[in-house]
């Protein structure tokens, strides 16, 4: 009698990161899941254009292309470092840097990569903070066609 290998349901896991402690915790969970499922990770960091909607923001100088390149280079270095760490734990990992609204970009990447799961850290903001600042995790959970795992920061 031959034994059938267990099904691998989580082949591609997209992990959104803002490089926070909370995002690192979410990445650790994602690495563990991918490792146990024989899956792959795709890390995503989204850079946002400075908000110009408020008077204070409008008074600030808009970053020139040199500043944008510095932001991109710093983010690429962090993504590559985090991908190497996941690879050392035996999980094939790729990464991507995007510009735009984080929730929209993560949903777009998850669909394009045919992700089985999206993993995000969540900071547990108050209702007022969510109303004023929004919540990337909340928006992804609400709008994504792909299942989403949110990981809270350790208290």
Residue positions per predicted region:
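Structural beta-alpha unit
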Residues: 1-9, 36, 81-118, 155
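Short, flexible loop segments at boundaries between secondary-structure elements
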Residues: 148-154
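Glycine-rich, Arg-bearing micro-motifs that act as flexible, cationic patches
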Residues: 117-139, 153
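Small/aliphatic-rich secondary-structure junction motif
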Residues: 3-62, 91
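General small-molecule cofactor/ligand-binding pocket signal
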Residues: 44, 94-98, 149
């Amino acid at each position: 009698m031959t034994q059938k290998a267990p099904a691998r349901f989580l082949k591609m896991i997209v992990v959104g990161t803002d490089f926070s402690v909370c995002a690192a915790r979410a990445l650790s969970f994602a690495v563990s899941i991918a490792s146990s499922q024989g899956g792959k990770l795709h890390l995503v960091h989204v850079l946002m254009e400075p908000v110009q909607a408020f008077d204070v923001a409008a008074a600030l100088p808009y970053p020139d292309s040199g500043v944008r390149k510095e932001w991109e280079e710093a983010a690429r270095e962090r993504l590559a470092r985090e991908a190497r760490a996941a690879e050392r734990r035996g999980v094939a990992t790729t990464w991507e840097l995007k510009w735009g609204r984080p929730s929209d970009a993560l949903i777009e990447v998850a669909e394009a990569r045919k992700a089985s799961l999206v993993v995000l850290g969540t900071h547990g903001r108050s209702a007022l903070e969510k109303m004023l600042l929004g919540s990337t995790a909340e928006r992804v959970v609400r709008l994504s066609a792909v299942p989403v795992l949110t990981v809270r920061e350790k208290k």
